[in-house]
Curated annotation (Swiss-Prot):
The keyword ATP-binding applies. It comes from the Bacteria. One of its GO terms (molecular function) is ATP hydrolysis activity. This is Uncharacterized protein SERP0979. It comes from Staphylococcus epidermidis (strain ATCC 35984 / DSM 28319 / BCRC 17069 / CCUG 31568 / BM 3577 / RP62A).
């Protein structure tokens, strides 16, 4: 169960995601890194009262990471036997839970076609390791997330993308962001929160102009910044949570300039 829920001034984002979920449609959440896509998936899991099994994609993702693997175990009689340990895809299918595939476009294109039957009307998979045919139990749903244009991402296969309905998830701002900061961080100082929100607006503008990376303007970075601002000067909090993560000196300087303007 999540302690906090997804919030957005555009209420249709969550409403539409919930409606698609109830129609058993595959949902693809598309938006910048740190915009709350995983929080939206967690909130759906909470609202629908269904556990969520997560796959974190990378170029190293393989079939075993998705489906599971064979291993040797000792049974009750003390004999060793080969057993198959279900991975997140098969667990979610068998138990009628949610499968959440994070950063799906980080995976190599040749890794994902094995999910085609899972993602279409069949909701079915043949386990290549055991030959077992698995049909998804009622309640099974698929949510995936994509960070377009992010370093390391690959163009998403059109046949795969066509199996999803896309929902754009943008950064939150204004009063909604203020509420999120107060609920999810230790910072309660109204004036400082307003300064942080204005600072974040400047970061987002620089992100859109290509001056800094998306991660610098992410909601999770903002929550960390707000927490640290309760125990150290705001300038040092920004240094620790945002600037020190960046390698490019020009990006670092751009954020230092934004600090001078806002604090």
């Amino acid at each position: 169960m999540v302690q906090t829920v997804y919030k957005n001034s555009d209420q249709t984002v969550f409403e539409d995601a919930k409606a698609l979920f109830q129609l058993n449609k595959n949902i693809l959440l598309k938006g910048p890194t740190g915009s709350g896509k995983t929080k939206l998936a967690e909130t759906l899991s909470h609202v629908m009262n269904l556990p969520m099994h997560q796959v974190n994609c990378s170029v190293d993702l393989d079939t075993e990471s998705l489906l599971g693997f064979k291993t040797i175990q000792t049974n009750e009689e003390g004999h060793q036997e080969i057993v198959f340990i279900d991975g997140p895809v098969i667990k979610a299918m068998k138990e009628g839970h949610i499968l959440y595939i994070d950063e799906i476009n980080m995976a190599k294109p040749e890794t994902l076609p094995i999910l085609n039957g899972v993602l279409d009307y069949r909701r079915q998979l043949t386990n290549p390791y055991t030959g077992e045919v698995i049909k998804a139990a009622p309640g099974f749903n698929v949510i995936a997330a994509i960070n377009e244009g992010y370093v390391g991402t690959l163009p998403m296969n059109e046949a795969l993308k066509n199996r999803f309905i896309v929902i754009e998830v943008d950064y939150i701002d204004g009063d909604i962001l203020k509420t999120v900061i107060k609920e999810q961080s230790k910072l309660q100082d109204e004036q400082l929160i307003q300064h942080i929100i204005k600072f974040n607006e400047d970061l987002r503008t620089m992100t859109k102009q290509g001056q800094i990376s998306e991660e610098a303007a992410s909601i999770r970075a903002l929550i960390d910044l707000s927490d640290l601002a309760t125990v150290m000067p705001i300038e040092r909090a920004v240094q620790r949570t945002i600037i020190d993560k960046l390698e490019d000196e020009r990006e670092q300087q751009a954020i230092l300039n934004a600090i001078e303007l806002n604090f």
